[in-house]
């Protein structure tokens, strides 16, 4: 069975999407990159459904930072917020509910947990799919950065990060080159981070 067919059977959806993109262009190169990152990908994305939890926590962190800093770039705090400071106390992970309650306490907005999960950014029928995709990309990119792997290297040949997620909206302008050169610099097309966070929090 070819690598691409094997890849389609895997459960680690977030790691798989980028690899399938690369595999269509160069299957051998994609296989090499995939297995170089396999241990990290499995540890972060597969173990005890951790991929969904980390996406949720990163999303809440992004919303909260938007309230605190307005248009300030959110990416700087995400790696440690997702993995260390915000969800680990004496090696114990906070639950998503605890994060949501803390967000409500600090901002006055209550986020619907039913709408925050690993699949949310893929559901195009959702009213704010564009905004959620923005924060999903924050989460994904920060996780890969923690593994010392830049997105441009993991997703070989990709030029538009949003394109990897079947998302064609012109409101999302995240480019791999921008991630490489400026660390998750984003253009919100007239909407600042606080406005996006408020819209998401109203769900």
Describe the role of every protein-language-model region.
Residues 153-163, 194-203:
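Non-catalytic, largely sequence-independent nucleic-acid-binding elements associated
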Residues 66, 72-73:
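Protein-protein interaction interfaces in oligomeric scaffolds
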Residues 4-63, 86, 90-140, 171-203:
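Intrinsic disorder/low-complexity detector
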Residues 77-87, 154-163:
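Amphipathic alpha-helical segments that form the core helices of the histone-fold
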């Amino acid at each position: 069975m070819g690598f691409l067919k094997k890849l389609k059977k895997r459960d680690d959806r977030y790691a798989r999407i980028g690899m399938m993109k690369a595999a269509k262009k160069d299957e051998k190169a994609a296989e090499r990159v995939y297995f170089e990152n396999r241990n990290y990908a499995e540890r972060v994305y597969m173990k005890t459904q951790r991929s969904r939890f980390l996406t949720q926590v990163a999303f809440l962190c992004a919303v909260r930072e938007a309230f605190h800093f307005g248009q300030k770039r959110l990416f700087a705090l995400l790696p440690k917020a997702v993995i260390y400071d915000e969800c680990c106390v004496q090696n114990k992970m906070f639950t998503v509910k605890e994060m949501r309650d803390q967000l409500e306490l600090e901002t006055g907005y209550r986020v619907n947990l039913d709408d925050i999960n690993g699949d949310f950014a893929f559901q195009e029928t959702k009213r704010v799919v564009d905004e959620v995709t923005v924060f999903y990309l924050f989460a994904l990119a920060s996780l890969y950065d923690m593994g010392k792997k830049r997105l441009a290297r993991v997703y070989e040949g990709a030029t538009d990060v949003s394109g990897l997620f079947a998302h064609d909206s012109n409101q999302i302008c995240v480019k791999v080159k921008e991630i490489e050169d400026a660390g998750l610099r984003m253009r919100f097309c007239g909407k600042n981070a606080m406005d996006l966070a408020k819209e998401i929090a109203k769900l």
